[in-house]
Amino acid sequence: MSTNGGAPSQKRSWLPSRPLLTTTTQTYPPPLLPFKKLHAPPTAARRSLPPAASKPMASSSSSSLPAAWAAAVRAWAVAPALRAAVWACLAMSAMLVAEAAWMGLASLAAAAARRLRGYGYRWEPMAAPPDVEAPAPAPAEFPMVLVQIPMYNEKEVYKLSIGAACALTWPPDRIIIQVLDDSTDPFVKELVELECKEWASKKINIKYEVRNNRKGYKAGALRKGMEHTYAQLCDFVAIFDADFEPESDFLLKTMPYLLHNPKIALVQTRWEFVNYNVCLMTRIQKMSLDYHFKVEQESGSFMHAFFGFNGTAGVWRVSAINQSGGWKDRTTVEDMDLAVRASLKGWEFLYVGDIRVKSELPSTFQAYRHQQHRWTCGAANLFRKMAWEIITNKEVSMWKKYHLLYSFFFVRRAIAPILTFLFYCIVIPLSAMVPEVTIPVWGLVYIPTAITIMNAIRNPGSVHLMPFWILFENVMAMHRMRAALSGLLETARANDWVVTEKVGDQVKDELDVPLLEPLKPTECAERIYIPELLLALYLLICASYDFVLGNHKYYIYIYLQAVAFTVMGFGFVGTRTPCS
């Protein structure tokens, strides 16, 4: 009997009442229907059809099979996985924008507080040191200072750092200049040694030190330098990389913070760049590093008295180094390693942005890639090695542990490099080809816009470069993500160390001899970066699909990304040496 008004009951078919897959642009038939031939007419009717009428139906049925299966795979496998990736990226984006907002507000508060009461630490000007030409017993307020200059085949810049260090204003009997030369080129070693001898002839207390091997790289050189008897007599150590040129009053400005505040272990100063206007890539680097110093270092110093040591242009208290275990070479970020360990011992750090030290930015794409790999991979690897040590530490507060684990390491050193590439270069382009997945506008537009605005606020003079900065950083995100994963997983390349190439002058043509060996014709192929070009092809496919068949309208952004990856894939970024 029927249950709907006496109508005869019918046997319920297992076929669905509507197509299994429905999108905003096209409806697909159930993928199993062609196998069962459920759409075929009865045998008698099929026999009555003319041949011309039956052939198109067979062709349509066979041609719909691949499309049906592709739609099924997309809807049942790709879409759920992509949707999960979208929400994971949105969660990480929220973490990143919250961290950026917190750091931005803290840095603005630090800037306001500095105008009212300075840096919050006692600082008193030092008495004039004795004349270098007529040495006299130095006042007791001038402690022994060691100036370390580690270098490795620095033919282009070794004179800059040595000359600047020897010109520092400090009693000559209270300062020691230590040049740590790990050069493997005998000619360069001879040049550096002759330069040290020349300054020694001018009554400068300078020491030239070499090692039999490069074990530990920079960390090993610094550690070996501290083992010398004369170095153990020093109370403080200033460190400058080979391309850094401190002003003569550097010690007179930084040392009072250390002398009058015994809890301070490190005074970090800001980098200034002599070659930032060489090319677009160096201008973009300056934007990123200015944000790093103005926001990350300033907020860390103001809120937590902690930040990552930048490896150069800073002055350390020797007792803090010794108490923290000295220099370790377990990662490629020995500077950050020492800073974290010193912080866990209760030491405080101070960032003084008013003191600037001239330095050089890498101007070739290859050199910049190596530098970013070392920094990103080393930081992620240090997170892996020190996470449990931070958790179990009993000498610092829970608030500082939270800052170290979550803000300093997890968000900035792990989430940031992975999210930028995964979300903006993989997930968003792929979603343009999957209409079942929609990204909320707040995650697609509002969050990246907020991050860009916060960066622009602290770099008002570089607002016109923001579009180029976004595209460049997204391309570099691929290398940073690979480096971060390499560090987190501690792969074979986790401890690769490549010294950043330096040129020593903004204009090479003004020099009598070339600073770099001309590239051989076969080496020109090294300018082609296959990963960038492959990703450019992927982005081009996604953008073209969205333009022709899609409805997300992401193609403008994706096309721009494809252009950026193509340009950098062929090496058309930074300075270039012509092929011979």
UniProtKB/Swiss-Prot annotation:
Which EC number(s) does the record attach to this protein? 2.4.1.32
User: What is the species listed in this Swiss-Prot or TrEMBL entry?
Assistant: Oryza sativa subsp. japonica (Rice)
Comp. bias regions, Low complexity: 15-27
Gene Ontology MF terms:
glucomannan 4-beta-mannosyltransferase activity; mannan synthase activity
Catalyses which reaction?
GDP-mannose + (glucomannan)n = GDP + (glucomannan)n+1
Q: Name one GO cellular component term.
A: Golgi membrane
Q: What does this protein do, in the record's words? A: Probable mannan synthase which consists of a 4-beta-mannosyltransferase activity on mannan using GDP-mannose. The beta-1,4-mannan product is the backbone for galactomannan synthesis by galactomannan galactosyltransferase. Galactomannan is a noncellulosic polysaccharides of plant cell wall.
Keyword list (alphabetical) reads: Cell wall biogenesis/degradation, Glycosyltransferase, Golgi apparatus, Membrane, Transferase, Transmembrane, Transmembrane helix
Q: What class of enzyme is it?
A: transferase
Would the keyword NAD be found if you checked this record's keyword annotation?
Answer: no
Q: Which residues cross the membrane?
A: 85-105, 414-434, 437-457, 528-548, 554-574
Which residues are involved in binding substrate? 241, 243
Please indicate which superkingdom the organism of origin belongs to. Eukaryota
Which intervals carry biased composition (Polar residues)? 1-12
Identify the taxonomic lineage of the organism of origin: Eukaryota, Viridiplantae, Streptophyta, Embryophyta, Tracheophyta
Q: Where is the active site?
A: 182, 335
Family per record? Belongs to the glycosyltransferase 2 family. Plant cellulose synthase-like A subfamily.
The entry's protein name is: Probable glucomannan 4-beta-mannosyltransferase 2
Under the heading Gene3D superfamilies, the entry gives: Spore Coat Polysaccharide Biosynthesis Protein SpsA, Chain A
Instruction: Give the span(s) annotated as Disordered.
Output: 1-33
Query: Which GO BP terms, alphabetically?
Result: cell wall organization
- According to the record, the signal peptide region is none
